[in-house]
Amino acid sequence: MSHATLNTLNTSPVTLIDRALLDAVSAEARNHPRLRKNRNFHRSDDAPGHRLLNAIEPGSYIAPHRHLDPHKDETMLVLRGQLGLVVFDENGAVLQV
C-alpha cells in the first residue's frame, strides 16, 4: 500500500494504520507551518462520519473549539507520543485537564 499521496480520499474499504502510515503523515506534519497534518479515511466530505488520522507534532496548538451539531462527536486516540487536553463545559469553565 502506497502512502505517497496522503491528501487523496481513501477508496479502499480497509486502511491499516501501521508504522509506515504514521511515519509518512508525521513527516508531512513536521513540514507544515501548523505542525500538523491529517489523513482522511472517509470517502467524501459529505460522509456522515469523518474519520481522520491527525499527526500533531510537538509545538502545535489546537485552539479550544466545540461542535454544536449533536451528530458531530470528536474522539481522540493517542497512538504514539503524548498530548495535553483541556475539556470545557458550555460556559467555558474547565471540567477536566
Per-region residue spans from a language model:
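Pocket-edge structural micro-motifs
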Residues: R43, A55, V87
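Generic marker of residues within folded, mature protein domains
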Residues: R43-D46, L68, T75
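A short, N-terminal "cap"/entry segment at the start of jelly-roll beta-barrel domains
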Residues: M1-H50
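Conserved short histidine dyad/triad with adjacent acidic residue
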Residues: L35, L53-K72
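A broad, low-specificity signal marking well-ordered, structured residues that form hydrophobic/aromatic
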Residues: R39, R51-N54, M76, L83
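Short strand-connecting beta-turns/loops that link adjacent beta-strands
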Residues: D46, E90-N91
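Glycine- and acidic-residue-biased ligand/ion/polar-headgroup-sensing regions
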Residues: H71-E90
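Short, intrinsically disordered, charge-balanced linker/junction segments flanking boundaries
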Residues: V94-V97
